Amino acid sequence: MPAFFVTGTDTEIGKTTIAAGLLHAARRAGLSTAAAKPVASGCEPTAQGLRNGDALALLGQCSLALAYEQVNPLAFAPAIAPHLAAREAGVELSAARLHEAVREVLALQADLTLVEGAGGWRVPLQGRENLSDLARLLALPVVLVVGVRLGCINHALLSAEAILGDGLALAGWVANVVDPATSRLEENLATLAERLPAPCLGRVPRLEEATPAAVAAHLDLRPLGIGL
């Protein structure tokens, strides 16, 4: 069943907000959903163990029964780059290990499964590996979340170039307006639409409450071909 790897042009540009919106749109259409965020840092201690807000947001939009540990198998407390957090904790952070964990979620064969990365495309894992190596092992088409602000065109085009250069398909992109005061906003969006070699799945404005339902109202799943 359709599955996609969700990446972004940078950290803190709304990958999870958009991923949760995509999952909500699928659920609203009567489709089953599942998700994974295989590694997360900045997690909070709870009685059940470390929990990450982004992973919990994705879990909340999964229609299939999933344990938190299936969605987020590697959770670290320090709010630092995952490879640094893993090194401090003495934990293996290899693409192969993350691949095995994600395969468990993919095996559920939901109508839509999203695997969300951390940060951007070249976030380091251990050794010389990056999260992009996980995407390559999974061989999933990619959805790129573009945080629309100053510099986003360069970030988006470089990200798309890297994705395609790694042999993966760019299935679509979403314009997430993180800075509504961006100069020449409409011209920037037009340039992105012209230059990015994939369909735009939606333009999400800066929302007062960016709930999955509110975000989903600005998204279109049809270009992903998931049978809506």
From Swiss-Prot:
Keywords noted in UniProt: ATP-binding, Biotin biosynthesis, Cytoplasm, Ligase, Magnesium, Metal-binding, Nucleotide-binding
Stated role: Catalyzes a mechanistically unusual reaction, the ATP-dependent insertion of CO2 between the N7 and N8 nitrogen atoms of 7,8-diaminopelargonic acid (DAPA, also called 7,8-diammoniononanoate) to form a ureido ring.
List of residues binding ATP: E12, I13, G14, K15, T16, T17, D54, E116, G117, A118, G119, P205, R206, L207
Organism taxonomic ancestry: Bacteria, Pseudomonadati, Pseudomonadota, Gammaproteobacteria, Pseudomonadales
Protein name according to UniProt: ATP-dependent dethiobiotin synthetase BioD
Keyword Aminoacyl-tRNA synthetase: no
Disulfide cysteine pairs (residue numbers): none
Binding site for substrate: S41
Pathway(s) where this gene product acts: Cofactor biosynthesis; biotin biosynthesis; biotin from 7,8-diaminononanoate: step 1/2
Active site: K37
Gene designation: bioD
PANTHER family in UniProt: DETHIOBIOTIN SYNTHETASE
Cellular localisation: Cytoplasm
Keyword Ligase set for record: yes
HAMAP family (alphabetical): BioD
GO molecular function, one term: dethiobiotin synthase activity
EC number: 6.3.3.3
Domain of life of the native organism: Bacteria
Binding site for Mg(2+): T16, D54, E116
